[in-house]
Amino acid sequence: MHYKKSIIGIAVTATAIIAGCQVTHQIVKSQGTAQGKHGEVQVETTFKDGHIVAIDVLKQKENKVLAGAVFKDVKQAIIDNNSIEVDGIAGATVTSKALKEAVGKSIEAAGVTLVATASAKKSEALTPAEYTYDVVIIGSGGAGFSAGLEAIAAGRSAVIIEKMPIIGGNSLISGAEMNVAGSWVQKNMGITDSKELFISDTLKGGDFKGDPEMVKTMVDNAVGAAEWLRDYVKVEFYPDQLFQFGGHSVKRALIPKGHTGAEVISKFSIKADEVGLPIHTNTKAEKLIQDQTGRIVGVEAAHNGKTITYHAKRGVVIATGGFSSNMEMRKKYNPELDERYGSTGHAGGTGDGIVMAEKIHAAAKNMGYIQSYPICSPTSGAIALIADSRFFGAVLINQKGERFVEELERRDVISHAILAQPGRYTYVLWNQDIENVAHTVEMHQGELKEFTKDGLMYKVDTLEEAAKVFNIPEDKLLSTIKDVNHYAATGKDEAFNHRSGLVDLSKGPYWILKATPSVHHTMGGLVVDTRTRVLDEQGKVIPGLFAAGEVTGLTHGTNRLGGNAYTDIIVYGRIAGQEAAK
């Protein structure tokens, strides 16, 4: 930890300090540093008469959306309570802890004794007991933002209510790659693709259990949705790079700047401010309001222990995501996915929208179809985005030093294959040549530090060293990689028929990561039509109620292909906003 101290105002002599003389109206500034999720967090704290009066963040590399909430709300709580013993932000615990530790170090550096105060309540404007909008959207992920912006564009008033203190949901913490057939990037790269092939891949990837019309609507509108993100929302995508996720026939997944959803959600937030789309955080939707005819006319929500009624003159859009973080719901619909499995999802993904809609007799379908993501942290369960090197040639190795599955297979296939290996884990191995193309280590330095600290990831110069750090039989690993290099040279993977072609791994340095599957996506959810209208248990439209994104249950079938979630949420989020605004 590094910190420094400066004193401004009345000079304090050594004698006065030793004697314990009290000096009033003294302003003290000091700095402190602590380790955040993606690098050091450095602050400068200003004290006066034993009180913290200001905290300035001098340096940080945290996720800009998560950091925004921490550096606003947690910082203010520290000032209000004159203490670092305050609650952090759910979903941003590491960043919250870093801020509090950095301020704590600055207190130590200043040598200031803070004045004890009664627990202060954060001053805030009185929250009205009710609001009225044309369209009320529940959830601030990609589907919710898309719906809200489209409602505003149609000339309607709209609001997004979000139960978490941070916007974005899983759309924020995902890689945010988006599959599109016929995108400008495919044209730049000379890749031939078609809507028909995209539809075929998606239906096959879900074992033909996905609804063909829902899939077709998603694919048909994908180009327009991506161009809307690029041109209207101002999301930056890499112009000359695409992912080919497992189950796809060609490279078709657009990659946002920074390789995470922070690029998308931050641009959504900026656009929402620009067009006057309010977002009410810490506001949990609890009940859908129906009139005498059965039409949905509003939402009852809770904020700081107070009930707030949101009247919706035209429609309510449910965009609350899935239930991967709700253990009881997971076990109810798929008992195998119990406490042994972590979750890649954010803490708020607990199925609230599904439960709320079922109470007014909305239909749900495919609830037992729950997907695991194959490459995640064995300690936290979080997805390992750094291992997206797999889409550029990284190989999967078991404890015996053998490959055991095609690296670009479907997520469910790879997950099951990993769980069948000794120890129920895999190693992901790649070299500098792959990193030069994938840039995953460069883009995910926070993960690199976290995985290295936990003993899950190493950078080594040779394959022999890679074998040694994880006690893999050296001779077997060398033999396996010799085969990989041969397959790369011939262009034919004789072992597992790698669909994109393997990459030569003869030159180091290498990165090797230990990983295991976690619950990732819930394919089941509310039954909707292609206009996103929610249907009841008799198959009839529930007037005034719409749903989009992971909360719905028809598009993906038994398994969602990588990169299809963002296509789904943006396409159907936009449709929901347009339909609700009519």
From Swiss-Prot:
Enzyme class: oxidoreductase
Lipid attachment locations (N-palmitoyl cysteine): 21
Subcellular location: Cell membrane
Lipidation sites (S-diacylglycerol cysteine): 21
SUPFAM superfamilies, per the entry: FAD/NAD(P)-binding domain, Succinate dehydrogenase/fumarate reductase flavoprotein, catalytic domain
Cofactor: FAD; FMN
Function: Catalyzes the two-electron reduction of urocanate to dihydrourocanate (also named imidazole propionate or deamino-histidine). The physiological electron donor is unknown; it might be the membrane-bound tetraheme cytochrome c (CymA). Enables anaerobic growth with urocanate as a sole terminal electron acceptor, and thus can provide the cells with a niche where no other bacteria can compete and survive. Is unable to reduce cinnamate and other unsaturated organic acids such as acrylic, crotonic, fumaric and orotic acids. Has no fumarate reductase or succinate dehydrogenase activity.
Similarity comment: family membership: Belongs to the FAD-dependent oxidoreductase 2 family. FRD/SDH subfamily.
UniProt protein name: Urocanate reductase
Organism: Shewanella oneidensis (strain ATCC 700550 / JCM 31522 / CIP 106686 / LMG 19005 / NCIMB 14063 / MR-1)
Gene from which this protein is expressed: urdA
